[in-house]
Swiss-Prot record:
Role summary: Catalyzes the attachment of glutamate to tRNA(Glu) in a two-step reaction: glutamate is first activated by ATP to form Glu-AMP and then transferred to the acceptor end of tRNA(Glu).
Subunit organization: Monomer.
Cofactor dependency: Zn(2+)
Listed CDD domains: GluRS_core
Name of this chain's protein: Glutamate--tRNA ligase
Protein's GO biological process: glutamyl-tRNA aminoacylation
PANTHER family: GLUTAMATE--TRNA LIGASE, GLUTAMATE--TRNA LIGASE, MITOCHONDRIAL-RELATED
Family the entry assigns: Belongs to the class-I aminoacyl-tRNA synthetase family. Glutamate--tRNA ligase type 1 subfamily.
Origin species: Treponema pallidum (strain Nichols)
Length: 537
């Protein structure tokens, strides 16, 4: 049997960590079994679904390197245009079971619902909004669970025909059995049984506008697309008995279900905005590498072996198995993800890292003015921080290639790069005097250090690495201060910041002349009125 799985989100928002984890597990499962990964868009909620969010789905998966074999948004396959039903059009990928957007499949859903009506397993409901609101209030008052009261379930055929002939607005509801239970075996959670009386009473299958509800479209599409395994979040467990009843009503074999563990924040609640970034776009714009995010998300609720954290996509595909999934919720650890990101950044070659950090540097305006026409064109097309407005000049690229080895160990995110490299492309800002003065030094001592630094930079540029360290320690001892306190004023003078790339490397790249000029500028602007402690140089 060919394994066929799917990721079927609704394009009602940006792709978030929970959805990406579901997509990734389906992708890995398909690859582990040489199967097919289908991407289906469930856009039946016409009031909330947008083309922009659908495009975000495709962009996100492509950025992560999660490829699909059938589905929408695939430029690699033959494409045709299909009507969405709302005046817009969308590209549908090739595949034997398309289209892969539900709004283009409404005829199929209506035909299948008609089958259920004919066999007495679904019925027309003519209750209007005011009556349904009265039912809701009564059930709430009587402390009954929410749901329909089955008022139209036993309408006589002639009553139904009369209402239809009169054009009374209607929906079509499913007849949930009034007794008995529905049982299924979940691949992760084991045996689950649900009393039919606890299932939402006679849910709507087809809405008054002719569009299907999620439950109908989900079941019809999974059957029509030959889906063999459904891997989805545990929040869908309560819906599974209804889906199984629909499979039974249609006379279809259901797929194997596997409900994945929830993704929680550190406080034990479902991961949400209050915990931090949750959408893939946020992580992308914050300077995370797709490989790092993919690797970390793949480990949320799944174990791949002891003693190893970093896996390539190919290794994840080879190791993934439903037997490796954990039943308990996974906790999203932002610090651990940051560690992953740093590891992947440092594994990049200087050439690769130069290309990766350039967009963030250019977008931060570090490398100078971007021509207005170039910037205007870039603004129209650029949606992510890792999309550059222009390519670097040869001089900019050459400078970056010298700086990258200096900053690589200090990068946790690509967004760290602009401030670390700014001093190599621009004259630094001039902080207030207090920024130059460590807690254990006074203003006079700092001025003396800076005066001495003017002469030191020439020696630093020409000396070997071991000799430079000996030289700097000796100078700090002459002043009777710690090495870190000795270097701090020099660092701020050269970079404008208390945190920077390694100081010796910075001086060598800037050169003696440029370094001396910056130190002179600081002495003149911030320490010219202080004549104390000039000695020591």
């Amino acid at each position: 049997m060919e394994v066929r799985v799917r990721y079927a989100p609704s394009p009602t928002g940006l792709q978030h960590i929970g959805g990406i984890r579901t997509a990734l597990f389906n992708f890995l499962f398909a690859r582990a079994h040489a199967g097919v990964f289908v991407l289906r868009v469930e856009d039946t909620d016409r009031s909330r679904c947008t083309a922009a969010f659908e495009q975000n789905l495709y962009d996100t998966l492509r950025w992560l390197g999660v490829s699909w074999d059938e589905g929408g948004g695939c430029p690699e396959t033959a494409v045709k245009q299909g009507a969405r039903g709302d005046g817009r059009s969308v590209a549908h990928a090739g595949g034997a079971y398309g289209p892969y957007t539900q709004s283009a499949r409404t005829d199929l859903y209506r035909a299948q619902v008609a089958r259920l009506v004919e066999t007495g397993q679904a019925y027309y409901c003519f209750c209007d909004a005011s009556r349904l609101e009265r039912v809701r209030k009564i059930r709430t008052l009587n402390r009954m669970p929410p749901g329909y009261d089955r008022h139209c379930r036993e309408l006589l055929p002639e009553e139904v025909r009369e209402c239809l002939a009169s054009g009374v607005p209607h929906v079509i509801r499913f007849k949930v059995p009034l007794e008995g239970s529905t049982h299924f075996r979940d691949a992760l959670l084991g045996d689950i049984e649900w009393q039919n009386e606890e299932i939402n009473p006679d849910p709507i299958l087809l809405k008054s506008d002719g569009f299907p509800t999620y439950h109908l479209a989900n079941v019809v599409d999974d059957h029509a697309m030959r889906i063999t395994h459904v891997l989805r979040a545990q929040e869908w467990v309560p819906s599974t008995p209804l889906h199984l009843l629909l499979y039974r009503a249609f006379g279809w074999q259901p797929p194997l279900f596997c409900h994945l563990p929830m993704v929680m924040g550190a406080d034990g609640h479902k991961l949400s905005k209050r915990h931090g970034a949750t959408s893939c776009d946020e992580f992308r714009n914050a300077g995370y590498l797709p490989e790092a995010l993919l690797n970390y998300v793949a480990m949320l609720g799944c174990s791949y072996g002891e003693g190893q954290d970093l896996f390539t996509r190919e290794q994840l595909c080879a190791h993934f198995s439903l037997s490796r999934l954990n039943k308990s919720p996974a906790v999203f650890d932002y610090k651990k993800l940051a560690w992953f990101n740093g590891q992947y950044i440092r594994a990049k070659s200087d050439e690769q890292l130069c290309a990766l950090v350039w967009p963030f540097i250019a977008n931060a305006g570090v490398c100078g003015h971007i021509p207005a026409d170039v910037e205007a064109g870039a603004v129209r097309t650029r949606r992510f921080a890792d999309e550059a407005p222009c390519a670097p000049t040869e001089a900019q690229r050459s400078m970056l290639m010298r700086v990258i080895p200096l900053i690589k160990e200090r990068l946790r995110f690509l967004t760290d790069a602009p401030e670390l490299v700014r001093c190599f492309f621009q004259e630094p800002s001039l902080p207030e005097q207090g920024v130059f003065v460590p807690k254990r030094l006074d203003v006079a001592q700092v001025r003396a250090v800076l005066v001495r630094a003017r002469g030191l930079v020439h020696e630093i540029v020409s000396a070997s690495e071991p000799d430079v360290e000996v030289l700097l320690r000796a100078e700090a001892e002459k002043f009777g201060i710690k090495l870190g306190d000795f270097l701090m004023p020099i660092r701020v003078a050269l970079t404008g910041a208390t945190v920077s790339a390694p100081l010796v490397g910075t001086i060598r790249i800037l050169g003696a002349s440029r370094s001396c000029a910056r130190i002179e500028h600081v002495i003149r602007e911030r320490f010219s009125d202080d004549s104390q402690g000039v000695g020591g140089g």
